[in-house]
């Protein structure tokens, strides 16, 4: 973490359980991020929190620290049964649930609290086997949680802590009815600690907090600037015919260490992947119909640096903790202006700088005014020389080949095709 991203407040300054502090310091967490410094005094006092902060600001560790401390500092209810978790953390996507679980594991090892994971797609029996042995903290997506609850594999009557992560995304994906179903099976709001964290807190999310939380305190970090001052934004106006060649030229010029390219449809993502894989890039494809095990493998390869570029739909835009992303390319401007914020929030994280490049083509340029109104500023426009765009490009690969691209990354210098103007 960059020092500019941290406050002077230390975790050890709070009256946290010693095992929690020990686990944090062992992982190198000493100073709090702004959202952590705001949230912890409230949660340690037993107050509910609804927190808004840009992605990469430490929301996950804020609610995990609070959850582990609360469970260690408060006894479980009397006569708690083996199928009754003490804390429930709900996430909108499988990938985010897996990431939260990974972040929680060091705390679990240090404290002895048991973790469970529940998400759809695969691993039903494996997840169930863990639950049957009893867990303290259950992390999951709403569909699988409801499935287990209806079959009495889990019972929520002993819940002492509940967390909603990326609550606005829950609305986007239509999960609010599921969330309310789960809340109705928990103890009343005033008998548990409730936390809600998200990059955006819309009116409907605040309404949910009012319904399901106990007079929550609202906390915000940098609410006046939605896109983050560390992200350099840039906009091009290509024709549809030049759009792909412009993207490939920009990649050659920027030569990003780690980049995510967002497009609005699965078909468009597959097209982009085919062009880049054919050109020798180490590129992965992440769309909604990719099998869960493969999605997790691709994310792991990208995080490790075995892949340099990830082409994705917005399934990857929310909540995932992928470190050191240097560039985000909006091949398509998103239809939802909030998705623009979440997309470019993949870069410029944890105090680092980042670069966002958007292509406003003939098809999606009409989305730009709403995006600029939402973020509160115009995106700087850059020009390019059409005659300098790459032309010697190989025929794109088709998806009959492996999606993650197995060609070695080129080690030569980028082609000299600087844009003019």
UniProtKB/Swiss-Prot annotation:
Keyword check for Nucleotide-binding, yes or no.
Answer: yes
Classification via SUPFAM superfamilies: P-loop containing nucleoside triphosphate hydrolases (SSF52540)
User: Could you tell me where this protein is found in the cell?
Assistant: Cytoplasm
Where along this sequence does the record place binding of ATP? 53-60
Q: Where is this motif: Q motif?
A: 9-37
Where does the record place the Helicase C-terminal domain? 245-390
Please give the residue ranges the record annotates as the region Disordered.
Answer: 392-421
- Recite the UniProt keywords alphabetically: ATP-binding, Cytoplasm, Helicase, Hydrolase, Nucleotide-binding, RNA-binding
Q: Which HAMAP family match?
A: DEAD_helicase_RhlB
Quaternary structure note: Component of the RNA degradosome, which is a multiprotein complex involved in RNA processing and mRNA degradation.
Provide the protein name: ATP-dependent RNA helicase RhlB
Native species: Escherichia coli (strain SMS-3-5 / SECEC)
Tell me the lineage of the source organism. Bacteria, Pseudomonadati, Pseudomonadota, Gammaproteobacteria, Enterobacterales
């Amino acid at each position: 973490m960059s020092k500019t991203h941290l406050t002077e407040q230390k975790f050890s300054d709070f009256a946290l359980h010693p095992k929690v502090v020990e686990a944090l310091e062992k992982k190198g967490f000493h100073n709090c991020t702004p959202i952590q410094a705001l949230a912890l005094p409230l949660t340690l006092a037993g107050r509910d929190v609804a927190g808004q902060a840009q992605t990469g600001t430490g929301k996950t560790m804020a609610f995990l620290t609070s959850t582990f401390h609360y469970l260690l500092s408060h006894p479980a209810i009397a006569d708690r049964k083996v199928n009754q978790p003490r804390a429930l953390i709900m996430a909108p996507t499988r990938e985010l649930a897996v990431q939260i679980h990974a972040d929680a594991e060091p705390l679990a090892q240090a404290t002895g609290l048991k973790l469970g994971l529940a998400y759809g797609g695969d691993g039903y029996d494996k997840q169930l086997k863990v639950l049957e042995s009893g867990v303290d903290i259950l992390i999951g997506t709403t569909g699988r949680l409801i499935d287990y609850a209806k079959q009495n594999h889990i019972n929520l009557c002993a819940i002492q802590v509940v967390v909603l992560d990326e609550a606005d995304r829950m609305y986007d994906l239509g999960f609010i009815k599921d969330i309310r179903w789960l809340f109705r099976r928990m103890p009343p709001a005033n008998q548990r600690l409730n936390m809600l964290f998200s990059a955006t807190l819309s009116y409907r999310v605040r309404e949910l907090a009012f319904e399901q939380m106990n007079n929550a305190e609202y906390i915000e970090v940098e609410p006046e600037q939605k896109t983050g001052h560390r992200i350099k934004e840039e906009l091009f106006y290509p024709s549809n015919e030049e759009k792909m060649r412009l993207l490939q030229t920009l990649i050659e010029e920027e030569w990003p260490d780690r980049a995510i390219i967002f497009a609005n449809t699965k078909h468009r993502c597959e097209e982009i992947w085919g062009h880049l894989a054919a050109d020798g890039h180490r590129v992965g494809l992440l769309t909604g119909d990719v099998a869960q095990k493969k999605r997790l493998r691709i994310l792991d390869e990208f995080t490790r640096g075995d892949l340099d570029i990830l082409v994705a739909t917005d399934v990857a835009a929310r909540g995932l903790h992928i470190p050191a992303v240097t560039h985000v390319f909006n091949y398509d401007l998103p239809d939802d202006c909030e998705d623009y914020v979440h997309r470019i929030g993949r870069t410029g994280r944890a105090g680092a700088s980042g670069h966002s490049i958007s292509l406003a083509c003939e098809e999606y340029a009409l989305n730009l005014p709403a995006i600029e109104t939402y973020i509160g500023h115009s995106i700087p426009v850059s020009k390019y020389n059409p005659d300098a765009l790459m032309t010697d490009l190989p025929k794109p690969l088709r998806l009959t080949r492996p999606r993650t691209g197995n060609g070695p990354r080129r080690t030569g210098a980028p082609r000299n095709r600087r844009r003019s103007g």
